[in-house]
A protein has these predicted regions:
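Radical SAM enzyme [4Fe-4S]-AdoMet core and its adjacent flexible, acidic
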Residues: 7-20, 25-129
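Radical SAM enzyme core and accessory elements
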Residues: 132-155
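Short, solvent-exposed loop/turn segments at secondary-structure junctions
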Residues: 4, 39, 70-71, 143, ...
Length: 155
């Protein structure tokens, strides 16, 4: 889900996205990990990121990831937003928890957002090198996980 407004989301996907698409009827919402690409002109500022955080909390999803576009084509290069441009830690009630960077290949960090006593887990991820995929999927000996988030289990 790359935008909080269904009309704008429909524009991004170039097709109509019905509002009921985010109802998640019959799905254990605690297992959902919402991912939002950072795209210039859409989610590209602290204000837009906060609206996305608030929408995620309103839906009841426990975690969201903001992911930078990889430089794989002209569109991605022209619409790239660096994680630092979002200034996630400038948003009130966002708290840094940990970071794992892989030099020039990967920038990853985790945060928590608290709104009215409701907690939202946030991860920020940007792979600058499209050929770099180390730690994208991790097997911890018991579960297959995406990234370094402890509770992000792939079924």
């Amino acid at each position: 889900m790359h935008h909080y407004d269904m009309g704008v989301l429909s524009e991004i996907y170039n097709c109509h996205i019905p509002s009921k698409a985010i109802d998640f009827e019959g799905i254990d919402i605690d297992k959902i990990n919402l991912s939002c690409n950072l795209i210039k002109g859409y989610i590209d500022s602290p204000e837009e990121a906060r609206k996305m955080l608030d929408t995620t909390i309103d839906i009841g999803i426990p975690r969201i990831g903001f992911v930078g576009l990889m430089p794989v084509n002209k569109y991605c290069k022209e619409h790239f937003i660096d994680l630092e441009e979002i200034r996630i830690d400038s948003i009130p009630h966002v708290y840094f928890t940990k970071s794992k960077n892989r030099g020039k290949n990967c920038k990853c960090s985790n945060y928590l957002y608290n709104r009215d006593g409701k907690m939202l887990e946030i991860y920020m991820r940007n792979y600058m090198n499209p050929n770099y995929c180390e730690s994208s999927v991790v097997f911890d000996g018991q579960h297959l996980r995406q990234g370094f988030h402890d509770n992000n289990i792939i079924y």
